[in-house]
Amino acid sequence: IPGQYSLQQNFPNPFNPSTEIRFDLPSDGYVNLEVYNLTGQKVKTLESRNMQPGFHSVIWDGTNHDGEKVSTGMYFYTIQAGTFYNTKKMLFLK
């Protein structure tokens, strides 16, 4: 079990067609992991549920909440778990 919360840089980055996002949870709790575009609009929710402590990873397939491929560009992914909040950038290239 990890000793602290963390959000790692996605890999690969830049990516196409998909990328892996890893995060660590030292305790169980509700996790919200979301992708946003440069204008701050939510593109997709990757996780929104109670999760157990441990080392986790999620694959984002470069689609929005309607299942459509997103445009080339910079995206942000954010995690909120308890009092932990973090944001990182990733680049989708077609």
Residue ranges and their predicted role:
Residues 14-16, 53, 70:
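Short coil/turn motifs at beta-sheet boundaries
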Residues 68-94:
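C-terminal tail/sorting-segment detector
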Residues 43-44, 70:
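Generic structural signal for well-ordered beta-strand positions
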